[in-house]
């Protein structure tokens, strides 16, 4: 029996869970989300936020979508918008990689760059200004607070992990951008499947440790960092802090060096935030109590999306680049 998808947004999910054989002790299992249709974990929320808006009747012909993004959510929304015939405007910090900008343009999105120093807060503010200029014309999807974000991970990512491990998952690690992945997967495994001893680990940049600060009851003090896709500088509404059992901070250098190791030692093209997540798993394994635990790690995107960044710096000499 043939299986034909009616549009590309319907092809999300069922990404492979791959054992890391040379990084760690063989207990780290990487969920390779670059196998999604627009090559990142954000394909899931891009599709579901648009499907949800259609179901609720707020997205209809003539309405244009608006969303702030660090890149991957924007690309995910752009491919779904193109597949389903919607116009899309994205606001994004100017510090994001040129590859992301080019992909967004190629998918037909209108791209508005915002001041890099203002981070995602600046992009969010600009998106809100655009919508306020004509509320009847524009619809803001709000990935940081839209319940359709964690919902898709609760419905797809969580069940996939549970099935692929036969329920033998002890630790779940995800970098936190919107918080949707960590929240949705944890809700499914801890709640629906009743595995309350699952250890859910949030990964954030050491230079912007806002989750650790929030859990410690400290003042939130975000900072600049180079781990694109995580560390938005605030606690997103979609991050359920009650589900977070542990927070691990990762430096820019740790994220980049581990992403390179994934490429060189495991043959997995991994982005910077993927490196951060695996670096967190390696830190966990330094604790003997985690030696025999199965650790599932989300690898959000492919390294090809970071060719112009520090991830690929120093790989070629000037002469080699000119050849």
Swiss-Prot record:
Optimum temperature is 50 degrees Celsius. PROSITE patterns: CYS_SYNTHASE. Its cofactor is pyridoxal 5'-phosphate. It comes from Escherichia coli (strain K12). One of its GO terms (cellular component) is cysteine synthase complex. Induction: Repressed by sulfate or cysteine. (Microbial infection) In addition to its role in cysteine synthesis, stimulates the tRNase activity of CdiA-CT from E.coli strain 536 / UPEC; stimulation does not require O-acetylserine sulfhydrylase activity. CdiA is the toxic component of a toxin-immunity protein module, which functions as a cellular contact-dependent growth inhibition (CDI) system. CDI modules allow bacteria to communicate with and inhibit the growth of closely related neighboring bacteria in a contact-dependent fashion (experiments done in strains BW25113 and X90, both K12 derivatives). Optimum pH is 9-10.5. Keywords: Allosteric enzyme, Amino-acid biosynthesis, Cysteine biosynthesis, Lyase, Pyridoxal phosphate, Transferase. It holds the Pfam family PALP. Disruption phenotype: Significant decrease in tRNA nuclease activity of contact-dependent growth inhibitor CdiA-CT from strain 536 / UPEC (deletion in strain BW25113). The lineage of its organism: Bacteria, Pseudomonadati, Pseudomonadota, Gammaproteobacteria, Enterobacterales. Its EC number is 2.5.1.47, 4.5.1.5. GO terms for molecular function: cysteine synthase activity; identical protein binding; L-cysteine desulfhydrase activity; protein homodimerization activity; pyridoxal phosphate binding; S-carboxymethylcysteine synthase activity; transferase activity. This is Cysteine synthase A. GO terms for biological process: amino acid biosynthetic process; cysteine biosynthetic process from serine. It catalyses: O-acetyl-L-serine + hydrogen sulfide = L-cysteine + acetate; thioglycolate + 3-chloro-L-alanine = S-carboxymethyl-L-cysteine + chloride + H(+). Hydrogen sulfide binds at residues 8, 35, 269. The gene is cysK. The modification N6-(pyridoxal phosphate)lysine is found at residue 42. Homodimer. Forms a cysteine synthase complex with 1 copy of CysE. Pyridoxal 5'-phosphate binds at residues 72, 177-181, 273. Belongs to the cysteine synthase/cystathionine beta-synthase family. Pathway: Amino-acid biosynthesis; L-cysteine biosynthesis; L-cysteine from L-serine: step 2/2. InterPro entries: Cys_synth, Cys_Synth/Cystath_Beta-Synth, CysK, P-phosphate_BS, TrpB-like_PALP, TrpB-like_PALP_sf.
